Amino acid sequence: MEKKKAFIPLLYLASIVFLPWWISLSFNKSLESWVTNWWNTGQSENFLNDIQEKSIIKKVLELEELFLLDEMLKEYPETHLQKLRIAISKETIQLIKMHNEDRIHTILHFSTNIICFVILSGYSILGNEELVILNSWVQEFLYNLSDTIKAFSILLLTDLCIGFHSPHGWELMIGSVYKDFGFSHNDQIISSLVSTFPVILDTIFKYWIFRYLNRVSPSLVVIYHSLND
């Protein structure tokens, strides 16, 4: 009976780890055809207009060089110009297809992540008992560690997440999340998040040390500051 009680929280933990991957894969496959059909039938005419406008303007500017080249080659034979116009038309069609695929990808991934978040939230609420058991295990494990190990672990974790060498890791992680939601890479937004988010975390962590650890374990705070210095 005790083994069964211990097995259920472990099974719940494993399901939390693998459930997001399974949900994402399943809904991506099932929603792909529906989103593609919805987008291509014109029902999305007014959807994401601002984003589309910027994207299309950028692509049109890229094509301007080809049109300028067309003007420069007017002195060439008509057959040569005809081939050039055909090539430009094909390139334009290809850009439109790529634009549609990007928009479909954005909508699909954003919808999938929202659905995944809702399902996981409901799953966490329904599994509240298992979460309580897992939390008690974690607290017992941390309680049995010495203050030195705790301080070393906190220092290692903070240096990895909010240390002076962490921006590259944050850039990769935020870029990965940004891509997972289906948005195209944007250096300005990612740089802004990288420069602000770790600072916010660092402030919260220092406040936590000041308010919580000073009250619960003063010796741990002393060891932490000694290692940090």
Curated annotation (Swiss-Prot):
Q: Which Pfam families match?
A: CemA
- Keywords, A to Z? Antiport, Chloroplast, Hydrogen ion transport, Ion transport, Membrane, Plastid, Plastid inner membrane, Potassium, Potassium transport, Transmembrane, Transmembrane helix, Transport
For the keyword Transport, the answer is yes
Topology in the lipid bilayer: Multi-pass membrane protein
Q: What molecular function terms (GO) are annotated for this protein?
A: antiporter activity; proton transmembrane transporter activity
Chief location: plastid
Provide a GO biological process annotation: potassium ion transport
Q: Which reaction does it catalyse?
A: K(+)(in) + H(+)(out) = K(+)(out) + H(+)(in)
Q: Name one GO cellular component term.
A: chloroplast inner membrane
Segments spanning the bilayer are 7-27, 114-134, 154-174, 189-209
User: Subcellular location, in the record's words?
Assistant: Plastid, Chloroplast inner membrane
Task: Give the protein's function.
Answer: Contributes to K(+)/H(+) antiport activity by supporting proton efflux to control proton extrusion and homeostasis in chloroplasts in a light-dependent manner to modulate photosynthesis. Prevents excessive induction of non-photochemical quenching (NPQ) under continuous-light conditions. Indirectly promotes efficient inorganic carbon uptake into chloroplasts.
Concerning its family, UniProt says: Belongs to the CemA family.
This protein's name: Potassium/proton antiporter CemA
Lineage in the entry? Eukaryota, Viridiplantae, Streptophyta, Embryophyta, Tracheophyta
Q: Which gene encodes it?
A: cemA
